[in-house]
A protein has these predicted regions:
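Active-site region of glycoside hydrolase catalytic domains
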Residues: 2-44, 88-89, 98-480
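Active-site-adjacent substrate/metal-binding segments within catalytic domains
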Residues: 22-101
Length: 480
C-alpha cells in the first residue's frame, strides 16, 4: 500500500450551482436556461428541464445533512441573479430569496461545511439578454456589479470565499460560437466582445468586493475551466495550432484575471483579424488593478489540437477561433465512453506546474473534477446502493497526480468533486450522473453512493491509501 497525505486544512468538497439544483420555485425572473426549456423542451434530454432540478430549494436541509454524511468540509454553490434580485435595473432584492440563501448558508455552517459562493454560473437573467443583448452590452456589466454588491453586503459576514464567474469561456463558446447554450449564435466578433465584457465584469466585481468587504478573511477569485492543449504531433503546424488554442481557451481569462492583462499575442491576432473587442484605457486599468486573490480550476479532460481543416486566410467562413486549430481525438485514448471525454489524470499535475511556473504559484484549488456516467442504475447492488467503483478510481488517479504537484510546491489548497448530488446539467439534463449522492428525479429520493463513503474516509484522513490493484489499473489503458 502507498499512502498519500494532503495538507491539514485542505478543502475536501464538491461543487454545484443554484440553477442546477434549486428548481424554479418562487423565482421572479427566468434565466436563459429556464427560458430555453420553456421555448425548446426538445433540446433537453428526455425533455427534462430545470423546473424541479434536485429540489434543493425545498430539500436543502436534508441535502446538506447528506453532504455532511459524505464527508464534505466545503461546498461551492452559486446565488442565482434571477432569484436574488427583484428589480434587475435597480438591483433591489427579493426578500424570500434573501431568507432562502441566509438559511442555506447557516445550514452549511451548522453542519461544519464551509460555504463557497459563486455569482454567475451560466445563468444570466433572460430579460437582460432580450432587452440589452446580454453580455454583449456593457450596461449589463453594471447590473451584474449591483447584484454582486448585494451578495457581498448580505452574506459576507458568514461567507469568506467568493468567485465571480464559473467557466466564462463556456458562456462565450456555448452562446456565441458553437450553439450549445442559448442564444445559440455563431458570431466570432460578438464572442470576442462577450469574453472581454465578462472579464471586465469580473474585475469590477472584485473592485467592489475590496471596497466594501468587512470580513478579514474575505477573498475573491474566478473559476476557469483549464485543459492543457496537446498537439496531435510534433509537426510545426500542429504545435502552432495547440499554442493558439491555449491562448484562446486558457490564457485569455487566466492572464487577465491573474496578471491583469490579456495575452499580447492573442490581442495582436484578434487585432489583425479585425475582431478585437471594444475597450477603453479606463477599463483596461480596472482589469490591471483588480486581479484575483485566488483561482478555481475546473478540469475534466485534456484538449488535443491539430492544424485547422481550412486555411486561416479562408473567406469561406466568418471568423472563428477554429480557423487556427481543430480538435483532435487521439487514437487509443482512454475514454469515458458515456460522456465522450478522454480520461487523462496527469494533466492535473501539468496544470498545477503551469500555475506554479507561469502564474506566480497563486493559491488555487480544484473547483470541479468529475466523471459523468449514464444509466448508473446498472451498478445498483442488492442493498440499493450504486457501486460506482469507476468514480472512486477516477478520483484516486487525479488525487495521485495532484498530490505529486503539491509535494513539488504547488499552492493547491483543495479538491472539489463535481458534484455532491446528481444535478440538472443544462441540455444534457440528467443523462450523465456525477454525484456522490444519487437522486431519483421522479420521487426526489436521495441515496449515498459507494463513492460517498470513500469520500468520507478520504476527508477524515486527509489522504488515502493506494493499493497494488490501483497501480495495476493506473498503468493500463482501459475504458470505464
Amino acid at each position: 500500500m502507498t499512502k498519500i497525505i494532503f495538507p491539514k486544512e485542505f478543502w475536501w468538497g464538491a461543487a454545484t450551482s443554484g440553477p442546477q439544483t434549486e428548481g424554479r420555485f418562487k423565482k421572479k425572473h427566468a434565466n436563459i436556461f429556464d427560458y430555453d426549456f420553456e421555448k425548446n423542451p426538445e433540446r433537453f434530454w428526455h425533455e427534462i428541464g430545470p423546473d424541479m432540478a434536485s429540489n434543493f430549494y425545498n430539500d436543502f436541509r436534508e441535502d446538506i445533512k447528506l453532504m455532511k454524511k459524505a464527508g464534505l468540509n466545503s461546498v461551492r454553490t452559486s446565488i442565482q441573479w434571477s432569484r436574488l434580485i427583484d428589480d434587475l435595473e435597480e438591483g433591489t432584492v427579493n426578500q424570500d430569496a434573501v431568507d432562502f440563501y441566509n438559511a442555506v448558508i447557516d445550514e452549511f455552517i451548522a453542519n461544519g461545511i464551509r460555504p463557497v459562493i459563486n455569482l454567475h454560473h451560466f445563468d444570466l437573467p433572460v430579460d437582460l439578454l432580450h432587452k440589452y443583448g446580454g453580455w454583449t452590452n456593457k450596461h449589463v456589466i453594471g447590473l451584474y456589479v449591483k447584484f454582486a454588491e448585494q451578495c457581498f453586503k448580505l452574506f459576507s459576514d458568514r461567507v469568506s470565499d467568493w468567485f465571480t464567474h464559473n467557466e466564462p469561456m463556456v458562456v462565450v463558446e456555448g452562446g456565441y460560437l458553437y450553439q450549445f447554450h442559448y442564444p445559440d449564435l455563431v458570431d466570432g466578433k460578438l464572442a470576442v466582445q462577450v469574453a472581454y465584457n465578462l472579464q471586465l465584469a469580473s474585475s469590477l466585481a472584485i473592485q467592489k468586493f475590496h471596497e466594501i468587504n468587512q470580513n478579514p478573511n474575505g477573498k475573491i477569485g474566478i473559476v476557469l475551466n483549464l485543459s492543457p492543449n496537446y498537439p496531435a504531433s510534433q509537426a510545426k503546424e500542429d504545435i502552432a495550432a495547440a499554442h493558439i488554442a491555449d491562448l484562446w481557451q486558457n490564457q485569455l481569462f487566466m492572464d487577465a484575471s491573474v496578471k491583469g492583462e490579456f495575452p499580447k499575442e492573442l490581442v495582436e491576432l484578434l487585432t489583425k483579424d479585425k475582431v478585437i473587442w471594444e475597450s477603453t484605457k479606463e477599463e483596461l486599468a480596472i482589469i490591471k488593478n483588480n486581479k484575483v486573490d485566488r483561482l478555481g480550476v475546473n478540469y475534466y479532460h485534456p484538449n488535443r489540437a491539430q492544424k485547422p481543416y481550412y486555411s486561416p486566410n479562408s473567406l469561406a467562413v466568418d471568423w472563428l477561433p477554429n480557423k487556427y486549430f481543430a480538435n483532435y481525438q487521439m487514437h487509443g485514448a482512454r475514454m469515458n465512453v458515456d460522456k465522450g471525454w478522454e480520461i487523462y489524470p496527469r494533466a492535473l499535475y501539468e496544470i498545477a506546474k503551469n500555475i506554479q511556473k507561469n502564474y506566480n504559484n497563486i493559491p488555487w484549488f480544484v473547483s470541479e473534477c468529475g466523471m459523468g456516467v449514464s444509466n448508473e442504475e446498472r451498478y445498483l447492488n442488492e442493498d440499493g446502493q450504486i457501486d460506482d467503483d469507476y468514480r472512486i478510481q477516477f478520483i484516486q488517479e487525479h488525487l495521485y497526480w495532484l498530490h505529486q504537484a503539491i509535494e513539488e510546491g504547488s499552492s493547491c489548497f483543495g479538491f472539489h468533486l463535481w458534484t455532491a448530488i446528481d444535478c440538472f446539467s443544462w441540455r444534457n439534463s440528467y443523462r450523465n450522473r456525477y454525484g456522490l449522492i444519487s437522486v431519483n428525479i421522479h420521487t426526489q429520493e436521495k441515496t449515498l453512493k459507494k463513492s460517498a463513503h470513500f469520500f468520507k474516509n478520504l476527508t477524515e484522513n486527509s489522504g488515502l491509501e493506494l493499493s497494488e490493484e490501483f497501480f495495476d489499473k493506473f498503468n493500463k489503458t482501459f475504458r470505464f
